[in-house]
């Protein structure tokens, strides 16, 4: 399987308390089916961070990978923007 076919997401790190694991919140805009209002939906992904490089509030890019644990199916690709 080529890596280019894997899903990628960009989000903010909301937790890095675990060893080699970060929690990334990804926001998507969704239109309400009945009323048409555009809402923000937040989904949290647990991602593998081998070098513990990401900190809270960093903007990061994650990529889909094989299952690494019960809940981890994503890995950190790069830190796009460091927190201020």
Swiss-Prot record:
Protein origin, superkingdom: Bacteria
Any one GO BP annotation for this protein: translation
Organism: Clostridium botulinum (strain Okra / Type B1)
PANTHER family: 40S RIBOSOMAL PROTEIN S11 FAMILY MEMBER (PTHR10744), SMALL RIBOSOMAL SUBUNIT PROTEIN US17M (PTHR10744:SF1)
InterPro entries on file: NA-bd_OB-fold, Ribosomal_uS17, Ribosomal_uS17_bact/chlr
Alphabetized GO MF terms: rRNA binding; structural constituent of ribosome
Pfam families, per database record: Ribosomal_S17 (PF00366)
Gene behind the chain: rpsQ
Record-given protein name: Small ribosomal subunit protein uS17
Keywords, comma-separated and alphabetical: Ribonucleoprotein, Ribosomal protein, RNA-binding, rRNA-binding
Record note on quaternary structure: Part of the 30S ribosomal subunit.
NCBIfam families named among the record's database cross-references: PRK05610.1 (NF004123), uS17_bact (TIGR03635)
Record function comment: One of the primary rRNA binding proteins, it binds specifically to the 5'-end of 16S ribosomal RNA.
Family to which the UniProt record says this protein belongs: Belongs to the universal ribosomal protein uS17 family.
One GO cellular component, as annotated: cytosolic small ribosomal subunit
């Amino acid at each position: 399987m080529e890596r280019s076919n894997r899903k990628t997401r960009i989000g903010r790190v909301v937790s890095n308390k675990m060893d080699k694991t970060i929690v990334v919140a990804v926001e998507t805009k969704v239109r309400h089916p009945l009323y048409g209002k555009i809402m923000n939906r937040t989904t949290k992904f647990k991602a593998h961070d081998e070098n513990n490089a990401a900190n809270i509030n960093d903007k990061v890019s994650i990529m889909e990978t094989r299952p690494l644990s019960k809940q981890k199916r994503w890995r950190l690709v790069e830190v796009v923007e460091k927190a201020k």
